[in-house]
């Protein structure tokens, strides 16, 4: 067992970066303590830092790299588009092709709009829900992460939880006065909130699986009861599938659990690793978006040709090669073996996950945000560093999900499991 890894070049780069970039990183989840490693390259299941260290990667850019890094099929699609130009400011045939493919997999989507990020997707979806319903309020789940726009940064997951900053300075109270919250997996509290506010309640937005505070899974029947509740009260249901979309199945969580929302947001995988976001829904809702309707949304890079080309390539490959069968089988295997390791060691830890998402929780299995907060964050961080020293890169936060890619080999999996045995 290796006790530490040499990161001299990364440390030097971090010292320089801190003088130019706040915190030395471009997103707070990358701010590994005492300093992050800086990536030089990545290929397949491996990622390499400036010091030449190589790691088996289960972070996978926080989800998008479902085929692994630098996949030849995606790279070929991007190169082909680069030869034709990479930004036009006009519609393209490619975006129509990708829109048709996405709508074919998601029964909740009759029409959709491309944006550049998941944050834009959820921000636009909520604006549209309010515009369509002529109502102001919405409900989000405690610990649900829907990007970094003002209305949703209330008890959000992801880096905000890790840093102990569930809210953010710079957001006037008036911006969130229409943001209501309910605990995950608590249909009784949700029912009370919905029924009390239904006259001015536009939508409920939810990650079907809480991916930035776990993963935490829905209890049996929870999503179906939520769907029934929102329908009965004339409230839109929005599934934020930025993480679960094309991850659990081609049709995401709504296919996996058999629940169809009114609107869906997507990101990460659907762009093949390039910047993209999608929001879509029923035709009568989506036709409210400009220029068809009076709800405004626009973006210079929306429908970016390279992102769309990469998206077409990854979706076609996932379907043709039946990738989800392998991914989900590997996920089942890893969760089972790590659970055995935890039991054999007599540890009070829990292995959580679904499909190709998994995580070891340093505490009891959580079913909501408040239960997740009881975990041993410092204990997990120490474990993260031990795994990194032994060539396994897990997300540095207790609250970020591990992902499996199609590039992870049997050898990768067995080496990883050996590292779990040695470092738990």
UniProtKB/Swiss-Prot annotation:
Cellular component GO terms held in the UniProt record: cytoplasm
CDD domains according to UniProt: OAT_like
Modified residues (N6-(pyridoxal phosphate)lysine): 268
Sorted UniProt keywords: Cytoplasm, Isomerase, Porphyrin biosynthesis, Pyridoxal phosphate
One GO process term, biological-process aspect: protoporphyrinogen IX biosynthetic process
Cofactors named for this entry: pyridoxal 5'-phosphate
Enzyme Commission number: 5.4.3.8
Pathway listed: Porphyrin-containing compound metabolism; protoporphyrin-IX biosynthesis; 5-aminolevulinate from L-glutamyl-tRNA(Glu): step 2/2
Major enzyme class: isomerase
Highest taxon above the source species: Archaea
Keyword Cytoplasm: yes
GO molecular function: glutamate-1-semialdehyde 2,1-aminomutase activity; pyridoxal phosphate binding; transaminase activity
Subcellular location(s) per record: Cytoplasm
Pfam families: Aminotran_3
Cited InterPro entries: 4pyrrol_synth_GluAld_NH2Trfase, Aminotrans_3, Aminotrans_3_PPA_site, PyrdxlP-dep_Trfase, PyrdxlP-dep_Trfase_major, PyrdxlP-dep_Trfase_small
Catalysed reactions, semicolon-separated: (S)-4-amino-5-oxopentanoate = 5-aminolevulinate
Regions that span the bilayer: none
PANTHER family from the UniProt entry: GLUTAMATE-1-SEMIALDEHYDE 2,1-AMINOMUTASE (PTHR43713), GLUTAMATE-1-SEMIALDEHYDE 2,1-AMINOMUTASE 1, CHLOROPLASTIC-RELATED (PTHR43713:SF3)
Family, similarity comment: Belongs to the class-III pyridoxal-phosphate-dependent aminotransferase family. HemL subfamily.
Protein name per Swiss-Prot or TrEMBL: Glutamate-1-semialdehyde 2,1-aminomutase
């Amino acid at each position: 067992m290796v006790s530490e890894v040499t990161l001299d070049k990364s440390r030097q780069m971090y010292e320089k970066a801190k003088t130019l970039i706040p915190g030395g990183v471009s997103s707070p989840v990358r701010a590994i303590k005492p300093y992050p490693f800086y990536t030089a390259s990545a290929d397949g299941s491996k990622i390499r830092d400036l010091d030449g260290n190589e790691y088996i990667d289960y972070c996978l850019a926080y989800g998008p790299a479902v085929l692994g890094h630098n996949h030849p099929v995606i790279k070929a699609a991007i190169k082909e588009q680069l030869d034709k130009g990479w930004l036009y400011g006009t519609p393209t045939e490619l975006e129509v092709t990708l829109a048709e493919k996405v709508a074919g997999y998601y029964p909740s989507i009759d029409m959709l709009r491309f944006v550049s990020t998941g944050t834009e997707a959820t921000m636009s979806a909520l604006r549209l829900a309010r515009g369509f319903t002529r109502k102001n309020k919405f409900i989000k789940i405690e610990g649900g992460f829907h990007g970094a726009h003002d209305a949703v940064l209330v008890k959000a997951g992801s880096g905000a939880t890790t840093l102990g900053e569930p809210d953010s300075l710079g957001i006037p109270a008036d911006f969130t006065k229409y943001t209501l919250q309910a605990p995950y997996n608590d249909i009784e509290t949700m029912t009370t909130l919905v029924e009390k506010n239904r006259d001015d309640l536009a939508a409920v937005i939810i990650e079907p699986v809480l991916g930035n505070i776990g993963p935490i899974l829905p209890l049996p029947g929870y999503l179906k009861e939520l769907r029934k509740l929102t329908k009965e009260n004339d409230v839109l249901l929005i599934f934020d599938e930025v993480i679960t979309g094309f991850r659990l199945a081609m049709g995401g969580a709504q296919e996996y659990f058999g629940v169809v929302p009114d609107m869906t947001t997507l990101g990460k995988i659907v762009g093949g690793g390039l910047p993209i976001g999608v929001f879509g829904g029923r035709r009568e809702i989506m036709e409210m978006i400009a220029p068809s309707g009076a709800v405004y949304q626009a973006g210079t890079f929306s429908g970016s040709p390279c992102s769309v080309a990469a998206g077409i390539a990854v979706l076609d490959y996932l379907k043709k090669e039946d990738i989800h069968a392998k991914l989900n089988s590997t996920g089942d295997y890893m969760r089972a073996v790590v659970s055995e390791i935890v039991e054999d060691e007599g540890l009070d830890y829990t292995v959580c996950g679904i499909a190709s998402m998994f995580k070891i929780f340093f505490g009891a299995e959580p079913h909501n945000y408040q239960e997740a907060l009881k975990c041993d964050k410092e204990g997990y961080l120490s474990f993260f560093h031990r795994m990194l020293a032994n060539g396994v890169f897990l997300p540095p936060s207790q609250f970020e999900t591990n992902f499996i890619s199609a590039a992870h080999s049997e050898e990768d999996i067995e080496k990883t499991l050996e590292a779990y045995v040695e470092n738990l």
